[in-house]
């Protein structure tokens, strides 16, 4: 395990909402919710910390957010402006290193092992970047500093907002033992439920399990979780990263025959894929359905749409059509997956922020 890298994960604090509060004094100190009209279909893209005190969070339906926070201010937001500010932040990063891996508009990995300023301390680099962003742009960022990307990302969320958390190689395993497994990369709702049923709530619980037992229970997720909780993870920051597809799949605890259960899974996947596509500022044209039967036979079917989309309904309808054409109901399904590929950037004026 290489522990020599110095990696920073920078995560802007409530980015879209913070930009709006910076630019519009009337929003400051008030519960601001970006996600469109609460009387129409929509999902919260992000919200200010004032709104979060009421239980509002990203990916929540705007109608639910309005019930939790009746005095909330709802706006659609301005994606083109957020992109502009994100580029300004990226320029600040580039003063320290060219090894930058953006994850979205508001977060990125930086490898500062050999940085342009010749600074030996990654902690000092992170602190200086935070200060520069605040001084020049009037925005706050949180930072995680460690020797691999997985730990740095978890650490950046530890002291929000405007915090900095450093995890050295010597501290890594103890740090990870206290973290809820729901914070681990790749642990979604389904995996979290499986872990809960197994009595695994924290990294410490996870660490008690052997690699083989985790793989048996959780398949590939088990392999990755075994490595993550021991601080063994990818430490290569990739400045050329570009997502070619966005997808979601799950292995059922019990084999499934009921097509309605499969359709429900596809709807959940379509919502998650839409959320990821919008965060990446992309839309896609090809929907791919993956089915694995109880005998481990795997098929994939794809449908290319007439136009690009990042809309839940359109993605689901295409996937459901593929399911109806592919699945007879005679053999049980072990795994189902949905992927959108053939991606390209979204034009700002067409971005469906209100539908995140």
UniProtKB/Swiss-Prot annotation:
Site for Substrate discrimination, residues: 16
Active site: 107
GO molecular function terms attached to this record: damaged DNA binding; DNA-directed DNA polymerase activity; magnesium ion binding
GO biological process, one term: DNA-templated DNA replication
Matches recorded under Gene3D superfamilies: 3.30.70.270, 3.40.1170.60, 5' to 3' exonuclease, C-terminal subdomain, DNA polymerase, Y-family, little finger domain
Assembly notes: Monomer.
Entries under InterPro entries matching the protein: DNA/RNA_pol_sf, DNA_pol_Y-fam_lit_finger_sf, DNA_pol_Y-fam_little_finger, DNA_polymerase-Y, DNApol_IV, PolY_HhH_motif, Rev_trsase/Diguanyl_cyclase, UmuC
EC number: 2.7.7.7
GO cellular component: cytosol
Organism: Listeria monocytogenes serotype 4b (strain F2365)
Enzyme class (EC, first level): transferase
Cofactor(s) needed for function: Mg(2+)
Coiled coil: none
Domain UmuC: 1-188
Lineage: Bacteria, Bacillati, Bacillota, Bacilli, Bacillales
Cross-referenced SUPFAM superfamilies: DNA/RNA polymerases, Lesion bypass DNA polymerase (Y-family), little finger domain
Protein known as: DNA polymerase IV
The protein's role, per its UniProt record: Poorly processive, error-prone DNA polymerase involved in untargeted mutagenesis. Copies undamaged DNA at stalled replication forks, which arise in vivo from mismatched or misaligned primer ends. These misaligned primers can be extended by PolIV. Exhibits no 3'-5' exonuclease (proofreading) activity. May be involved in translesional synthesis, in conjunction with the beta clamp from PolIII.
Keywords associated with the record: Cytoplasm, DNA damage, DNA repair, DNA replication, DNA-binding, DNA-directed DNA polymerase, Magnesium, Metal-binding, Mutator protein, Nucleotidyltransferase, Transferase
Protein's UniProt keywords contain rRNA processing: no
Catalytic activity: DNA(n) + a 2'-deoxyribonucleoside 5'-triphosphate = DNA(n+1) + diphosphate
Subcellular location: Cytoplasm
Family, as annotated: Belongs to the DNA polymerase type-Y family.
